[in-house]
From Swiss-Prot:
The modification N-acetylalanine is found at A2. A motif (GPALPP motif 3) lies at residues 93-98. Keywords: Acetylation, Isopeptide bond, Phosphoprotein, Ubl conjugation. This is GPALPP motifs-containing protein 1. It comes from Rattus norvegicus. Residues 41-59 have a biased composition (Low complexity). Residues 14-27, 177-195, 235-269, 277-287, 295-317 have a biased composition (Basic and acidic residues).
Length: 348
């Protein structure tokens, strides 16, 4: 036997060195998977011719032996050869071990891709070598398969399971009711005037310190900084405000006319003032004002000299706290209403 070849073959330009032992040995198959039955290597042509001649001689000998043995032995031999030929057809790859039995039919190949519609079937086609290849799709409609898959291949909404309550009269009544509502309420599809939302036309609430102020409760409500609507007023709003101001001025002028003193009151007031100047002494308020005026004039004309430190004058210490100051201002505001004459007739 020849030496087993392991590894890649030599290029065609290089010739393998043959030894005497290799020439004496019989050629053996190359290590690796066997070739398909329809393919043969070129190196084995000579050996195949020798094998063919030897096989022919062996077949002749076998036929002669079978003739001697009888017809039964010849029939068994033919059946065995036919089984061997069937086993070799369509085989690729290495042979199975002797303990395993070859399957009669190869398993179906898995389908890759979308499935065919239920009415189409692939027609198998035979190849040149006798093998079946999947052919073109034929639009052959199988009625039995279609009937079995009717329930599974439903596309669209399912039909109603119960009786359908549909009445032509009820549909007409609904349409008439809709038309009646549309006529009574007006056309809802009419274009509405486009108005901006409030956040587009109004200023946001005024924020002080942006959350950085003291975390205490408010003692009193914040005073309004003023009318901030000037920034968002439209021409219509400005015209409306101007009319309101004019009406307010007219009402004030009417009140002033009502409060105007009559000629009789003016005449009596002049007589009373002249009588008081001639007959009565000065009031305490007038005396106090005169003293303050004279003192201020004297201090202005007096020569200024260095005086010792006086805490009240130099530091101007406030003798009233905030609460006393507010109470004094509030009481002084009421003096005019307490000691003034009425708004009507001054004299009876």
């Amino acid at each position: 036997m020849a030496r087993d070849l392991i590894g890649p073959a030599l290029p065609p330009g290089f010739k393998e060195r043959a030894t005497v032992e290799d020439q004496e040995r019989d050629p053996s198959p190359v290590a690796g998977p066997a070739l398909p039955p329809n393919y043969r290597s070129s190196s084995s042509d000579s050996s195949d011719s020798n094998e063919d001649s030897s096989s022919l001689s062996e077949e002749g000998n076998q036929e002669s032996e079978e003739d001697d043995a009888g017809p039964t032995a010849k029939k068994q031999r033919r059946n065995q050869d036919r089984d061997d030929d069937d086993d070799d057809d369509g085989f690729f790859g290495p042979a199975l071990p002797p303990g395993f039995k070859k399957q009669d039919d190869s398993p179906p190949r898995p389908i890759i891709g979308p499935a065919l519609p239920p009415g189409f079937i692939k027609s198998p086609q035979k190849n040149d070598k006798g093998r079946e290849n999947p052919g073109q799709v034929s639009p052959f409609f199988n009625s039995e398969e279609a009937e079995s898959g009717e329930d599974e291949d439903i596309v669209g909404p399912m039909p109603a399971k119960g009786p359908v309550d549909y009445s032509v009269t009820a549909e007409f009544e609904k349409r008439a009711q809709r038309m009646k509502e549309k006529l009574t309420k007006g056309d809802d599809d009419s274009p509405k005037p486009v108005t901006r939302e409030s956040w587009m036309t109004e200023l946001p609430p005024e924020m002080k310190d942006f959350g950085l102020g003291p975390r205490t409760f408010k003692r009193r409500a914040d005073d309004k900084s003023g009318d901030r609507s000037v920034w968002t007023d439209t021409p219509a709003d400005r015209e409306r405000k101007a009319k309101e101001i004019q009406e307010a001025r007219k009402s004030l002028s009417k009140k002033d006319e009502e409060n105007m003193l009559s000629g009789r009151d003016k005449r009596l007031a002049e007589q009373v003032s002249s009588y008081n100047e001639s007959k009565r002494s000065e009031s305490l308020m007038d005396i106090h004002h005169k003293r303050l005026k004279t003192k201020a004039a004297e201090d202005k004309n007096r020569h200024q000299e260095r005086t010792p430190f006086d805490r009240d004058k130099d530091l101007k210490v406030n003798r009233f706290d905030e609460a006393q100051k507010k109470a004094l201002i509030k009481k002084s505001r009421e003096l005019n209403t307490r000691f003034s004459h009425g708004k009507g007739n001054m004299f009876l």
